[in-house]
Amino acid sequence: MEWISFFERQPEDGQGIWYYGEHIGVWAGEYSYSPNDPFSPHLIFCHESPGLVDRMDAPWWMVDDGVMNRPIKPAKDYPDDYPSG
């Protein structure tokens, strides 16, 4: 499995994923797409600790097949297509 940029491709709504952010590390969670959410349409609900994360704070993801152990973090903290400015 390899890390995918959230800005290149999003998981399916309700899909189990691993996600990574520079300030939060690697966690398992579930992606939720809610286009009318006033906070963000792209949210990740953590499976390991109560809380949710926006894709701006965790710009990398990979499919959680339920078998793989915690993956190592990506080689770069931010993908090349991460919005800046």
Spell out what each predicted region is:
Residues 9, 23, 66-67:
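Short, solvent-exposed coil/turn elements at secondary-structure transition points
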